[in-house]
Structure formats: structure tokens, C-alpha cells
């Protein structure tokens, strides 16, 4: 007898980036919530297109004094831009997380796939 069943696709990624929720609690919670709402955990680096995507992502979300607008997926990823999850968080949490993520991925070439995990 022959049995056939569809196998679940396993997402392809090149690197795993683990974000420590005890160091960046607001950013980590935003990403967790965005993932729970269907935003991708595997994203593709595209640094050249980031400037245009951040404008699209933040369009219509006004700045508030004492907060930064955090987006997931971030604009440095092809999946970012229009439709990204936006949350206002503390500037120190946002800027430290963005700086750390940018530094960790600085030598990684465009089109690399990164899987984000919150720990």
C-alpha cells in the first residue's frame, strides 16, 4: 500500500539572531506580538531599500514626545515597509536594540535570510 502525505515546508534561513528580552524588553515584546499576529520570523536583508521602506512603514503613525516608533519587520528587511507592525516604545530600548541588531548583521550580505528568536 502506498501512502502519501504533504510535508510541512520548513522555512529556509541562513542565520539565527536571538534577541534577549531581558536586555530589550519593549522591542522583544513588540516582535513577539507581531509574530503572533502573523508577521514573519524569517526575514531577508535588503539594506539598500531600507530608506524607502521606513517611510512606508511609518506613514500615518505620528511621533509622540518621549517615544520612538518601532517597526517589525524592520525596514532593513525586504519584508518591512508598508504593513509592518508599528509600536511606540521608549527611545532607549528601541535605539539600543536597533544598534545591536545592526551591528550583529553589519557584515551579512543582502539577500541573507535571518530567523529571529526572542529569548
Where are these regions (language model features)?
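Nuclease and nuclease-like effector domains acting on nucleic acids or nucleotide cofactors
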Residues: 1-69, 73-119
Amino acid at each position: 500500500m502506498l501512502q502519501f502525505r504533504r510535508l510541512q515546508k520548513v522555512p529556509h534561513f541562513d542565520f539565527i539572531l536571538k534577541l534577549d528580552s531581558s536586555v530589550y524588553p519593549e522591542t522583544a515584546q513588540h516582535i513577539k506580538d507581531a509574530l503572533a499576529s502573523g508577521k514573519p520570523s524569517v526575514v531577508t536583508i535588503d539594506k539598500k531599500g531600507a530608506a524607502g521602506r521606513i517611510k512606508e512603514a511609518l506613514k500615518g503613525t505620528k511621533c509622540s514626545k518621549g517615544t520612538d516608533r518601532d517597526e517589525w519587520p524592520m525596514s532593513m528587511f525586504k519584508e518591512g515597509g508598508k504593513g509592518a507592525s508599528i509600536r511606540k516604545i521608549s527611545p532607549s530600548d528601541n535605539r539600543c536594540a536597533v544598534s545591536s541588531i545592526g551591528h550583529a548583521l553589519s557584515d551579512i550580505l543582502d539577500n541573507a535570510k535571518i530567523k529571529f528568536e526572542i529569548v
